[in-house]
Amino acid sequence: MNHKDPLVSWNVFGLDVVFNLSSIMMLIITAVIVFVIAIICTRNLKKRPTGKQNFIEWVFDFVRGIIESNMAWSKGGQFHFLAVTLIFFIFVSNMLGLPFQLISGHTLWWKSPTADATVTLTLSTLIILLTHFYGVRMKGTKGYFQNYTKPIFLLPINIFEEFTSTLTLGLRLYGNIFAGELLLGLLAGLVTGDSTRAWGWIIGLPGLVVWQGFSIFIGTIQAYIFVMLSMVYMSHKVQDSH
């Protein structure tokens, strides 16, 4: 389990900027998979949907329900495609590391990109920044920042809340996916390790199968939670009351 990430460091204006090549590769693969799913499911659309069109319409309806549970559709409708893209992207990201891990030497190349805290915190930061952008856009600068100063003594708490929202949104996703893959690796080690003792197979193989199924469930739930909380934070910024 002593695997390392393929890191590359570049010096930019005197600062060392580190990139994880594995995470970058997996993010690109995730984006390609989501794009292919979208193309396949939206080709040759019909008035009476069947098969893949039924699936994509169900996803859109499901995500619409998430949005409408947090804000009026007149305001939340513009975030429909954002939320659908998020739920697909995070779900696929969560699933990629479950079937197997690709290791060259001691370098881990294939894993779920959401098992990297940098990736999940970047996603959560982008979501929080988007909530501020749309808050200012829909309320105006003055109306938006009044939410932070009414009453004035809550200003420090409101500012602190922005940081905690970013951290909890990103770290919740990272913690669940990373822990799941870590345990999968341990169970796989019992089955494929150097030891040929029967107990390794007896414990490891059933545990691996059960935990694979549980990890699929957790990955699905985490995609839902991330999108739900994103829309909750968005509604706080664009609704008339904070």
From Swiss-Prot:
Keyword Zinc annotated: no
Record localization: Cell membrane
GO cellular component entries: plasma membrane; proton-transporting ATP synthase complex
Keywords recorded for this protein, A-Z: ATP synthesis, Cell membrane, CF(0), Hydrogen ion transport, Ion transport, Membrane, Transmembrane, Transmembrane helix, Transport
GO molecular function annotation: proton-transporting ATP synthase activity, rotational mechanism
Pfam families recorded: ATP-synt_A
GO terms (BP aspect): proton motive force-driven plasma membrane ATP synthesis
Stored Gene3D superfamilies: ATP synthase, F0 complex, subunit A (1.20.120.220)
Transmembrane segments: 21-41, 79-99, 116-136, 173-193, 198-218
SUPFAM superfamilies listed in its UniProt record: F1F0 ATP synthase subunit A
Membrane topology: Multi-pass membrane protein
Its biological purpose: Key component of the proton channel; it plays a direct role in the translocation of protons across the membrane.
Assembly mode: F-type ATPases have 2 components, CF(1) - the catalytic core - and CF(0) - the membrane proton channel. CF(1) has five subunits: alpha(3), beta(3), gamma(1), delta(1), epsilon(1). CF(0) has three main subunits: a(1), b(2) and c(9-12). The alpha and beta chains form an alternating ring which encloses part of the gamma chain. CF(1) is attached to CF(0) by a central stalk formed by the gamma and epsilon chains, while a peripheral stalk is formed by the delta and b chains.
Family: Belongs to the ATPase A chain family.
PANTHER family the UniProt entry points to: ATP SYNTHASE SUBUNIT A, CHLOROPLASTIC
Record-linked NCBIfam families: ATP_synt_6_or_A, PRK05815.1-4
Protein name in the entry: ATP synthase subunit a
Species this protein is from: Staphylococcus saprophyticus subsp. saprophyticus (strain ATCC 15305 / DSM 20229 / NCIMB 8711 / NCTC 7292 / S-41)
